[in-house]
Amino acid sequence: VRDRFDDFVAQRLDRLLRYATALTCDPHLAQDVVQETLLRAQHRWERIAGLQAPESYVRKMITNEFLSWRRRKASRNVTAAHSTLDAIGTPTADHAEHYAERDAMRARIAALPRKQRAAIVLRFYEDCTDAEIAEALGCSAGTVRSHISRALSTLRAADGGRRRGLPVTEALS
């Protein structure tokens, strides 16, 4: 059982860290969330390994750990920095402008309420359907659509309605 868990972690750790980084907007917090999740998963690995999609289950555990962390640390200021967005976005003539737009988008994403941020990450980073997001967040598909709609509206409003070099929907793709 231990060897199968070690193989799972070796094959999927980078992907799980990228997912957690997109959720948290903080690479250090992402490492903490993944570490806590994998510790819990290791104790339950016999049951998890028998599931049809163990990686999806562990990803849901990461989502839940992130949501729980946000509840526990509601007043903590989250640093909006993750390397997965470095190379994303429409090329601009001025690299400084590109980085400023990227940083502004990161800050807007980091400021979203936790469930809206999770819904946005699951939709645009993990390419999940409404049903998959609803299952991960423990809500209905209609609520997922509402979370995504509100998040996109908030992101657009925070941008002053301008459609600049980094479109909202490309920030996590």
Please annotate each region the language model reported.
Residues L137-R162:
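DNA-recognition helix of helix-turn-helix
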Residues E46-A49, K60-A81, E97-H98:
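Arg/Lys-rich amphipathic alpha helix in sigma70-family domain 2
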Residues D32-L39, Q52-N64:
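Structural recognition of an alpha-helix C-terminal capping motif at a helix-to-coil junction
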Residues A119-R123:
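A short pre-motif secondary-structure segment
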Residues V1-R18, H28, Q42:
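A short, charge-rich alpha-helical start-of-domain segment used by transcription regulators
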Residues H28, A131, G142:
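Residues within helix-turn-helix
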